[in-house]
């Protein structure tokens, strides 16, 4: 009986913590970015499906660091890369980069 109760308690704790740490978009702006097929194909692998960031792979796009960047800074980062961020100038059209920039700015309410 104790084993059963311990299993139920551990499972309950696991699910409670999973729900606590689950990251879902806090507003429609993240959903707009992550619904963009260009984002899904080129960005989500490192920045996460909901732009939450993926530890060492890529930072959150809804963060103080991203919020501090101007549209030109974001555009340059996407086009030219920096550090572990690959270059996308040859892979994406300028209007696709601009759409990503605008959506990142919206997430950060600029």
PLM feature segments, named:
Residues 16, 37-40:
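Processing junctions and N-termini across compartments
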Residues 31-36, 48-77:
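Gly/Gly-Pro-rich "capping" loops immediately C-terminal to redox-active cysteine motifs
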Residues 72-88:
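Short Fe-S-cluster ligation motifs
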Residues 39-49, 100:
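The canonical Cys-X-X-Cys-His
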Residues 78, 90-110:
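C-terminal capping alpha-helices of c-type cytochrome domains
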Residues 34, 56, 83, 94-95:
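Surface-exposed, polar/charged faces of alpha-helical domains
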Residues 1-29, 110:
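N-terminal export/targeting leaders of redox proteins
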Residues 50, 82, 107-108:
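A general structural signal marking secondary-structure boundaries and capping sites
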């Amino acid at each position: 009986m104790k084993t059963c109760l311990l299993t139920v308690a551990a499972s309950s704790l696991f699910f409670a913590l999973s729900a606590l740490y689950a990251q879902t978009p806090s507003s429609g702006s993240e959903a707009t970015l992550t619904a963009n097929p260009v984002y899904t194909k080129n960005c989500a692998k490192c920045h996460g499906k909901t732009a939450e960031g993926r530890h060492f792979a890529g930072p959150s796009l809804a963060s103080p660091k991203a919020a501090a960047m101007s549209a030109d800074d974001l555009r340059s980062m996407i086009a030219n890369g920096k550090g572990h961020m690959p270059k996308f100038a040859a892979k994406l059209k300028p209007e696709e980069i601009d759409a990503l920039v605008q959506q990142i700015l919206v997430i950060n309410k600029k």
